[in-house]
Swiss-Prot record:
GO terms for biological process: defense response to bacterium; defense response to protozoan; innate immune response. This is Putative defense protein Hdd11-like. May have antimicrobial activity. Induction: In larvae, by bacteria. Residues 1-18 form the signal peptide. It is found in: Secreted. Residues 19-166 form the Reelin domain. Glycans are attached at N41, N96. Keywords: Antibiotic, Antimicrobial, Disulfide bond, Glycoprotein, Immunity, Innate immunity, Secreted, Signal. Disulfide bonds join C28-C105.
């Protein structure tokens, strides 16, 4: 029993170490982290909010991921804007952002993931800037995978609909 527990913990530690510096590109479509455990089947203790419910195409807006309680911090994230299942738009970050980095999921900067950081720099709230394509005229949702730890994560956390108008 002790051996099984130790082996399982080493596997989790290996995956956390492997992807501690952000989601791999192989997770872009299904947004499933390549951890050796499955997602939580409970309601996520996180919410995604936006600075507006309607945005003009090509105009930047803010998107925020927050824990519902102070103890609901984030170790890792994968965030995208989706028009149906299509990844759309582009995120921008400050060069000195200590938590997040851009990820290329088919287009440069169309997703955000976490950087490697010590646990004391986990975040309870993060805000990013996203710009819809200049020719988009449709509804989108922000979709995220949010990890509390390497072994505890939630898939499919979504924002309310945002209408993008041309």
């Amino acid at each position: 029993m002790w051996f099984t527990y130790t082996f399982a913990m080493l596997l989790v530690a290996g995956y956390v170490s492997a992807y501690g510096s952000g989601a791999p590109q192989s997770a872009c479509q299904d947004m499933i982290p390549r951890h050796p455990v499955g997602p939580q089947n409970t309601s996520a203790p996180y919410i995604i909010t936006t600075s507006t419910k309607v945005v003009k195409a090509g105009t930047p807006m803010q998107v925020t991921i927050s824990g519902k309680k102070p103890e609901n911090t984030m170790r890792g994230i994968l965030l995208q804007a989706r028009q149906g299942d299509k990844i759309v738009g582009k995120f921008t970050l400050d060069d000195n952002d200590s938590f997040a980095q851009l990820l290329d999921c088919g287009e440069p900067g169309n997703a955000i993931t976490h950087k490697r950081h010590p646990p004391e720099f986990d975040k309870q709230t993060v805000t990013f800037t996203w710009t819809p394509p200049a020719d988009l005229n449709d509804n989108i949702r922000f979709r995220a995978t949010i990890a509390y730890s390497g072994a505890v994560f939630w898939l499919g956390v979504e924002s309310p609909v945002v209408k993008v108008v041309a």
